[in-house]
Curated annotation (Swiss-Prot):
It is found in: Cytoplasm. This is Ribosome maturation factor RimP. Belongs to the RimP family. NCBIfam families: PRK00092.1-2. It comes from Oceanobacillus iheyensis (strain DSM 14371 / CIP 107618 / JCM 11309 / KCTC 3954 / HTE831).
């Protein structure tokens, strides 16, 4: 059910975003407690503002009401992905070269399932990161297929 709702929502929101020159980052349909949430994360170069999120929310809400694909009551949320933006697509990794990222793996590489460091390169199949162990810099190559989750990591 969840993946069906996500697919239908993507079909409905894509033309809206293309018209406004916005990017779809992610869609989630999740139950939290008793409530269902349909969350649509959008962005653009230079960041997105609350007015743009509101416009997309109104237009998407109209489209969802027309086709009515969701049987249960839910809350629609349209927002920016935030500063710790998820890296979901290969293009996200290309756009994040030189940035600090956090990666969680399906299985360990060199004894670890989590890495945080600078994304050095991405060739479409392998993520190369530089990370620190105490004061020493190390490098790890991670096959894209082994990445469970990845996001921008903010450091202070």
């Amino acid at each position: 059910m969840s993946s069906h709702v996500v697919s239908l929502t993507e079909e409905l929101v894509t033309p809206i975003l293309e018209e406004k020159n916005l990017e779809l980052v992610d869609i989630e349909y999740v139950k939290e407690g008793k409530n269902w949430f349909l969350r649509v994360y959008i962005d653009k170069e230079g960041g997105i503002d609350i007015m743009e999120c509101g416009e997309v929310s109104e237009l998407l809400s109209e489209k969802l009401d027309e086709s009515d694909p969701i049987t249960e009551a839910y809350f629609l949320e349209v927002s920016s992905p935030g500063v710790e933006r998820p890296l979901k697509k290969k293009e996200d990794f290309d756009a994040s070269i030189g940035k600090n990222i956090f990666v969680k793996l399906y299985e360990p590489i060199d004894g670890s399932k989590e890495y945080e460091g600078t994304l050095q390169s991405f060739d479409g199949e392998t993520v190369t990161m530089e990370y620190k162990v105490k004061t020493r810099k190390k490098q790890v190559e991670i096959p894209y297929s082994k990445i469970a989750k990845a996001r921008i990591a903010v450091t202070f």
